[in-house]
Design a protein with these regions (language model features):
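Amphipathic alpha-helical segments used for helix-helix packing
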Residues: 94-123, 169-173
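Hydrophobic/aromatic-rich alpha-helical bundle segments in the mid-to-C-terminal region
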Residues: 111-114, 143-189
Length: 192
């Protein structure tokens, strides 16, 4: 990466980090672009070099955070698979459990993301994390070897991630219609 590219990436990351902290602290609606640029220590025009508006910024934060969570979960899955062979169903249950555990420990993330946890899958081609792409690709290809098509596998992963994200959002943010302790057994059974 060239010095200019690295500097631009650092500036973009700085804006994302500053906005994330402000959105957590003050909420999305109560944070202005002026708040973000002040916190990031940049000029307002610089903000618009990287993002169209506050909604674009929020979308990028959600993609980034959901990709980070997914990466963590898939890294844990890869470690587990080193010690034992797992079916696709077992892998999906493991992923579900890890996502629930992670979001339970970091409820501020799901509060901010809402029911948009699967965003990183919607924008998979824009994710800059090659290792995450590689782990997802490995998961997909393992399932292809078990007789499922690539599209069917991607759809299954999407459905599971969307289901888990939505259930976690309702359970952690509203504790309604069910607390996570009440719904988790049925969630796992649904994924299975």
């Amino acid at each position: 990466m060239s010095k200019v590219s690295e500097k631009q990436q650092n500036k973009r990351t700085n804006i994302l980090d500053a906005a994330y902290e402000l959105f957590i602290e003050k909420s999305f609606n109560n944070t202005s672009i002026d708040d973000v640029v002040k916190s990031a220590g940049i000029a307002k025009g610089t903000f618009y070099l990287y993002f169209k508006d506050k909604h674009d910024l929020m979308e990028r934060i959600i993609i980034r955070k959901s990709a980070l969570i997914l990466r963590y979960v898939l890294e844990e899955l890869m470690k587990k698979k080193e010690t034992c062979k797992m079916t696709f169903s077992e892998q999906m249950l493991f992923i579900t459990e890890k996502i629930v555990d992670y979001l339970e420990e970091h409820t501020e993330i799901i509060t901010l993301m809402g029911k948009n946890f699967s965003s990183c899958l919607n924008y998979f081609s824009t994710i800059e994390d090659d290792e995450l792409k590689s782990m997802l690709s490995e998961l997909v290809h393992e399932n292809i070897e078990n007789g499922f098509s690539e599209q069917e596998t991607l759809k299954r992963i999407y459905l599971i991630v969307t289901l888990v994200g939505s259930v976690c959002y309702d359970s952690f943010v509203f504790e309604s219609p069910f607390k996570i302790s009440e719904i988790k057994p049925l969630l796992f059974k649904s994924v299975e």
